[in-house]
Curated annotation (Swiss-Prot):
Species the sequence originates in: Maricaulis maris (strain MCS10) (Caulobacter maris)
UniProt cross-references to SUPFAM superfamilies, sorted A to Z: Anticodon-binding domain of a subclass of class I aminoacyl-tRNA synthetases, Nucleotidylyl transferase
Compartments where found: Cytoplasm
GO molecular function, one term: zinc ion binding
Name of this protein: Cysteine--tRNA ligase
Catalyses which reaction(s): tRNA(Cys) + L-cysteine + ATP = L-cysteinyl-tRNA(Cys) + AMP + diphosphate
Length: 461
């Protein structure tokens, strides 16, 4: 079996994955800031790293992989949302955290092993800041505690930026209490109407970068195997996480592998709330099965940009119809216990090459469709389901997928008969009969789609 290779942003190349302890593989991924609904761009890292989570658990064992994805529940945007709504911050954060879990669950995203909340880790954050102050890597100024970027000589290595160039290119007004424009906030004073906690520097709250460093250390250790997130987090968030964690831990690396997924775009623009070009997962799942959205997010390599369009979703649905059409035709054949086929695994082990894995999945669907004996069908069905499951796909009931579960048996038998008649007419090139049967099916509100594995149909509302 091929080894797992992953593209490490720090090394700027693919590397064989070698966990520090195969009995305890650790992964931390930056999760949502819960002040509003998640858009489909926010769902991309959730789906990407859920897929990696599945791969790692298959390689090392379900109980040997510890995956932490945090919840940021203290933030300027959260505070502003609470002010505008007149609701307590705790109500805002718990409400949107619940919706986030439900929306991601609809996309087949499994829950992480650990879901730490920032506000549950204030003592750890204060302790890390104290450590940085005592060791000369941070300083107090005007009620703030800031990280002294000049004290960490490798700052900018992850994002491949030069510190002097960053300082020279600073275009925003620099706070007077900063020694350098590049210094960033570890702890900030809290206003009377803002959430705050007592600290050696007065009542305040943590900076965003500090939160992830403290939570990662608390639950996974000083050096973890994998740290992931969107490419927009490389700088400044992950760069700052590295600086404060390495300096707090006497030079120990924060993570051995840094993984970043590409942007989701609408046209030529990155999808973002600030640009107002977002599509909310909460809305999309009203019009599409969550599996369609998940599949669409996997059609491009995770490091590449992905353009989100209605055409992409239409193609994705047709692709899933082909897979479920094969599973439906296999009917009552019980899937044989099967391992994931090697060619499919090879694609996933090559830096999560999901486009290649999806291509292999359709090869398996074709094999299942061509199987003749019940033994061959059972084996092919088992392999198809095992591979699809690695991607979080193909686990729904085929009849439910096509909207057939509530059909009267007599009506279903009639439709099946019409489908067979139309297929026979098409094979005999009797186009008038085929068209006439299709008209009958349209009158019954039946949508027929023809594909390489045969025709599939669904009952329309």
């Amino acid at each position: 079996m091929t080894s797992l290779t992953l593209f490490d942003t720090m090394a700027r190349r693919k590397r064989d994955f070698e966990p520090t302890d195969p009995g305890r593989v650790t992964m931390y991924v930056c999760g949502p800031t819960v002040y509003s609904y998640a858009h489909i761009g926010n769902a991309r890292p959730a789906v990407v790293f859920d897929t990696l989570f599945r791969v790692l658990r298959r390689l090392y064992g379900e109980d040997q992989v510890i995956y932490a994805r945090n919840i940021t529940d203290v933030d300027d945007k959260i505070i502003e949302t609470a002010r505008e709504s007149g609701k307590p911050i705790e109500d805002i954060t718990s409400h949107y955290a619940d919706i986030y879990r439900a929306d991601m669950g609809a996309l087949g995203v499994t829950l992480p092993t650990i879901e730490p909340h920032a506000t549950d880790h204030i003592p750890e954050m204060i302790g890390m800041v104290q450590n940085l102050v005592y060791s000369g890597h941070a300083y107090e100024a005007d009620g703030h505690v800031l990280f002294d970027v000049s004290s960490y000589e490798k700052y900018g290595r992850l994002s491949n930026r030069d510190l002097d160039d960053m300082i020279a290119g600073a275009r925003v007004e620099v706070a007077s209490y900063k020694r350098s424009p590049a210094d960033f906030v570890l702890w900030k004073p809290a206003k009377d109407d803002e959430p705050g906690w007592d600290s050696p520097w007065g009542r305040g709250r943590p900076g965003w970068h500090l939160e992830c460093s403290a939570m990662s250390e608390k639950h996974l250790g000083k050096t973890i195997d994998i740290h992931g997130g969107g490419t927009d987090l490389v700088f400044p968030h992950h760069e700052n996480e590295i600086a404060q964690s390495v300096c707090a831990h006497k030079g120990a690396p924060m993570a051995n592998y840094w993984l970043h997924n590409g942007f989701l775009t609408m046209g030529t623009d990155k999808m973002s709330k600030s640009l107002g070009n977002v599509q909310l997962v909460h809305d999309l799942i009203k019009d599409y099965p969550g599996e369609v959205l998940r599949y669409a997010l996997l059609t491009a390599h995770y490091r590449a940009p992905l353009t989100w369009t209605a055409d992409l979703l239409a193609k994705t649905r047709r692709s899933l119809d082909r897979i479920y059409g094969v599973l439906r035709r296999l009917g009552e054949i019980e899937a044989a216990p099967s391992d994931v086929p090697p060619a499919f695994l090879e694609a996933l082990h090559d830096d999560l090459n999901t486009p290649k894995a999806l291509s292999e999945l359709f090869q398996l669907a074709g094999n299942a469709n061509k199987a003749l004996s019940d033994v061959e069908k059972a084996q092919a069905k088992g392999e198809l389901l095992a591979a699809a499951g690695m991607l979080g796909l193909g686990q729904a009931d085929p009849d439910a997928w096509f909207g057939l579960t509530d059909l009267d048996p007599a009506e279903r038998a009639r439709i099946d008969d019409l489908i067979v008649r139309r297929q026979t007419a098409r094979e005999e090139k009797d186009w008038p009969t085929a068209d006439a049967v299709r008209d009958e099916l349209n009158a019954l509100k039946v949508q027929v789609d023809d594909g390489p594995e045969g025709s599939t149909w669904r009952k329309l509302d």
